[in-house]
């Protein structure tokens, strides 16, 4: 099965190439870039030297020949590709935010007019597997909403309020240099940002509504001086108290068939490079604390995109994703 990665120079693009190289049926035949057309992929992603001989190309949409296309382009750029690819019979997984939210919410949150909106399944397989299976187009979730939603989903319907506190590695900001991610500003620091206004809050609220939760939802992210990982602490304030045995049983039952969710003490080091979400939960009655850890570039982006592709195309869900985390 031939794969095209549109916008392949970023961190998510590099991870797509790495992970798809371990897939039993997928071959990346096209990695696009306007900026470095003609450059070898391994010159931009040195970890892929000896792993791929591809060079970046810059074809028009009509020139792309593939069975599946991954869009790893900036937010608000995905919408210019999707319909044209679908009309040519190419399945699409969009890693941008362009189709995750209802149109009016997207336009309010991202401050742009959507020029080609239509509804797409939200690609969080642990919650929406049957909506994803066999489809031709999937909107891949954001990294923060993935870790947060998996942390809170089992108790969402019992909650009055959910407060998400997330710490993320610097790669979540992408590969464009900025003062925010400049080494002297990041090193030896944990820094909050967009404390009440982060765009991913809209996805978190949307997923809670789909879980029939009526809980108020709040979110504050922080930047960690590490490359990868998101650790999310969800403070779940319940209407009625639940003891430790009850909440553990709820979580273990909820995720008992989920191969990528592990009930164990979460650490971003233990999930690095993998598609796993590790989580644990502790109750003090009407307040439950659930903590999850994911790799923001894998379960939070490229790995989950491949998990969605596998469901779309009828492959084993863990094809290309069966590796353990890189620890230590």
Curated annotation (Swiss-Prot):
UniProt xrefs under Pfam families: Semialdhyde_dh, Semialdhyde_dhC_1
Keyword line: Amino-acid biosynthesis, Arginine biosynthesis, Cytoplasm, NADP, Oxidoreductase
Record's catalysed reaction(s): N-acetyl-L-glutamate 5-semialdehyde + phosphate + NADP(+) = N-acetyl-L-glutamyl 5-phosphate + NADPH + H(+)
UniProt-listed Enzyme Commission number(s): 1.2.1.38
Subcellular location: Cytoplasm
KW Oxidoreductase (keyword) present: yes
HAMAP family per UniProt: ArgC_type1
InterPro entries to which the protein is assigned, alphabetical: AGPR_AS, AGPR_type-1, NAD(P)-bd_dom_sf, NAGSA_dehydrogenase, Semialdehyde_DH_NAD-bd
Name used for this protein in its record: N-acetyl-gamma-glutamyl-phosphate reductase
GO BP, one annotated term: L-arginine biosynthetic process
Main location: cytoplasm
Domain of life: Archaea
GO molecular function terms noted in the UniProt entry: N-acetyl-gamma-glutamyl-phosphate reductase activity; NAD binding; NADP+ binding
Entry similarity comment: Belongs to the NAGSA dehydrogenase family. Type 1 subfamily.
Protein task: Catalyzes the NADPH-dependent reduction of N-acetyl-5-glutamyl phosphate to yield N-acetyl-L-glutamate 5-semialdehyde.
Gene3D superfamilies, A to Z: Dihydrodipicolinate Reductase, domain 2, NAD(P)-binding Rossmann-like Domain
Enzyme class: oxidoreductase
GO CC annotation terms, alphabetical: cytoplasm
Annotated pathway: Amino-acid biosynthesis; L-arginine biosynthesis; N(2)-acetyl-L-ornithine from L-glutamate: step 3/4
Keyword Plastid: no
Annotated catalytic residues: 143
């Amino acid at each position: 099965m031939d794969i095209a990665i549109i916008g392949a120079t970023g961190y998510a693009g590099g991870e797509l190439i790495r992970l798809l190289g371990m897939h039993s049926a997928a071959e990346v035949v096209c990695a696009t870039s306007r900026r470095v057309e003609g450059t070898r992929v391994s010159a931009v992603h040195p970890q892929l030297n000896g792993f791929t001989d591809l060079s970046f190309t810059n074809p028009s949409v009509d020139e792309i020949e593939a069975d599946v296309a991954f869009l790893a382009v900036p937010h608000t750029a995905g919408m210019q590709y999707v319909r044209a690819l679908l009309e040519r019979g190419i399945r699409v997984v969009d890693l941008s935010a362009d189709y995750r939210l209802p149109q009016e919410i997207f336009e309010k949150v991202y401050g742009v007019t959507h020029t080609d909106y239509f509804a797409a399944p939200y690609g969080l397989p642990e919650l929406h597997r049957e909506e994803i299976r066999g489809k031709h187009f999937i909107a891949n979730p954001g990294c923060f909403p993935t870790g947060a939603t998996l942390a809170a989903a089992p108790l969402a319907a019992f909650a009055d309020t959910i407060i998400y506190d997330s710490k993320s590695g610097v790669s979540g900001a992408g590969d464009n240099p900025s003062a925010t991610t400049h080494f002297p500003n990041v090193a030896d620091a944990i820094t909050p940002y967009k404390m009440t206004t982060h765009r991913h809050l809209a996805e978190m609220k949307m997923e809670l509504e789909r879980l029939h939760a009526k809980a108020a939802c709040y979110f504050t992210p922080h930047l960690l001086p590490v490359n990868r990982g998101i650790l999310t602490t969800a403070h779940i304030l319940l209407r009625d108290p639940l003891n430790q045995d009850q909440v553990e049983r709820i979580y273990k039952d909820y995720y008992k068939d989920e191969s990528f969710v592990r009930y164990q003490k979460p650490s971003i080091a233990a999930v690095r490079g993998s598609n796993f979400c590790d989580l644990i939960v502790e109750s003090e009655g009407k307040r439950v604390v659930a903590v999850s850890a994911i790799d923001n570039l894998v379960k939070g982006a490229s790995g989950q995109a491949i998990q969605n592709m596998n469901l779309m195309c009828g492959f084993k869900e863990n094809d290309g994703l069966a590796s353990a985390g890189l620890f230590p």
